Amino acid sequence: MDACVSMSENYFDEALPRLLALLNDPDPTIYRTAVKGLGVFGHGVLFPLLDLYDKTDNGTVKACCIKAFVQVAVNFPDAVFPEQAIQALKLALDDINPVVSQSALMTLGYFSKQEHEKERVIPILIQVCNSTNIAHVQSAVMSLAEIDSTEVDQCFERMINHDSTDVLIKEILEASMSRRQSLFGN
């Protein structure tokens, strides 16, 4: 990681295009390392990542761009993401590639636990709870379970009391509500 920090501080303009290009590498070890490396570069990589995300049809590259957002957030926890990044994540939820959409959900879930991002992200995750995609609903519910919010309480109550809610989702909701009770005493 020291090498990435050194590159970000001394060779940003030279290293950034190379790291972005490595997201196209077929070797998972290479592109995963590039994702981690991009996270060390900070918020200066967000717009190039958004640009690459918009230009590529490669699902792995799209997912890597999204996962790099999390790495930036991990390394720079106090910085606020631009609205374009949040909107890209919201649009990625509808991507036909499940790796891309689940990566977006994972990233939104991570952001939902950050004090300065939760106001923008919680409503998106609540909206996902109304999806017909059970995997998405499950991910959203599990992310929301760890957030102390009356909006989440209301969402969970609506879902668990609604007749059309899938049985599996109701089980996840019950477990999530129990978790919320132990975390927040709600």
From Swiss-Prot:
UniProt xrefs under InterPro entries: ARM-like, ARM-type_fold
Role description: Involved in the biosynthesis of bilin.
Highest taxon in the source lineage: Bacteria
Keyword Manganese part of the UniProt annotation: no
Gene name tied to this protein: cpeZ
Keyword Oxidoreductase: no
Keywords, sorted A to Z: Antenna complex, Phycobilisome
Name of the molecule in the record: Bilin biosynthesis protein CpeZ
Entry-linked Pfam families: HEAT_2
Ranges annotated as spanning the membrane: none
CC annotations in GO: phycobilisome
